[in-house]
Design a protein with these regions (language model features):
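Non-heme Fe(II) oxygenase metal-center motifs and adjacent flexible, charged/small-residue loops
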Residues: 1-206
Length: 206
C-alpha cells in the first residue's frame, strides 16, 4: 500500500547521496494505532551523550531494538539492543516490502526516537558509525506530529528540507551519510509528540 508517493524514485539530494521519499505508506487508522502502541509499549528512556567531555541527558527519549543484542555506540555512549517487539517487526516487514521491488534490504535493528513536542529536536549529525558499514541503507518512518527534517552538506553547506508526516517513509542510501548531516528542527508551534523509527542493518559483530 502506498497512499501518497510523490515520486519515490526521485532523489531529494542534489548530489553526493540518495534520499527517496516513499510518501505515506500507512492508512490514517494504521498510523494512529502504531503511534498509540509505540508510546505505551516501547521501553523509552532519555538519551545520553558525551559532548565536549560532559555527560548530557536529553529531553528526547530513545529505544534500541534488534535481532541480536547488538552493541551500538554513538555520541560517546554505548547501548545494547533489546529483543524485537512484535509490532516493530510488523512495521519493519511493511517497510521492507516497500523497498523490495527496486532494492531489497533486510533490516536487523531499529533505533527509535520520541519527541514530546516541538521543543525537542535532533542536532546535526550523520549515521556513519563503522558498525553500519559503508553506504548503508537507513529507512526512516514517522508517526505523530509533522516535523521538518533537514539535510546539510558537510562541505558546501547546501541544505535540503522535507516535512515528514504521520505514516511517512523516507530512505537514505549510498554515500548520504558520508557527505550529508541531517537534523530534526525545533518549532514552538508544535505541541504534540512525534515518534521516528530508523531501521538499520548492523554488520556482524565479533
Amino acid at each position: 500500500m502506498n497512499l501518497f508517493s510523490p515520486h519515490p524514485d526521485d532523489n531529494l539530494l542534489p548530489y553526493d547521496g540518495i534520499v527517496n521519499d516513499y510518501g505515506v505508506i500507512f492508512t490514517p487508522q494504521q498510523a494512529d494505532d502504531y503511534l498509540d502502541y509505540l508510546q505505551q509499549h516501547i521501553a523509552w528512556r532519555h538519551d545520553e551523550a558525551v559532548i565536549y567531555g560532559k555527560h548530557i541527558t536529553t529531553a528526547r527519549q530513545v529505544a534500541w531494538y534488534g535481532e541480536q543484542n547488538f552493541a551500538y555506540t554513538y555520541s560517546g555512549t554505548a547501548r545494547t539492543a533489546l529483543p524485537w517487539d512484535s509490532v516493530l517487526s510488523d512495521i519493519k516487514q511493511q517497510v521492507e516490502q516497500q523497498l523490495a521491488a527496486v532494492s531489497p534490504v533486510r533490516f536487523n535493528s531499529c533505533l527509535l526516537n520520541r519527541y514530546a513536542d516541538g521543543s525537542q529536536g535532533m542536532a546535526w549529525h550523520s549515521d556513519d558509525e563503522a558498525c553500519l558499514g559503508k553506504d548503508t541503507v537507513i529507512a526512516s518512518v514517522s508517526f505523530g506530529a509533522t516535523r521538518k527534517f533537514a539535510f546539510k552538506h558537510k562541505q558546501t553547506q547546501e541544505k535540503r528540507e522535507i516535512m515528514l508526516q504521520h505514516g511517512q517513509l523516507i530512505v537514505m542510501r549510498g554515500s548520504t551519510q558520508s557527505h550529508w548531516r541531517h537534523a530534526i528542527m525545533k518549532s514552538s508551534k508544535i505541541h504534540t509528540p512525534r515518534i521516528n523509527l530508523t531501521f538499520r542493518t548492523m554488520l556482524p559483530q565479533g
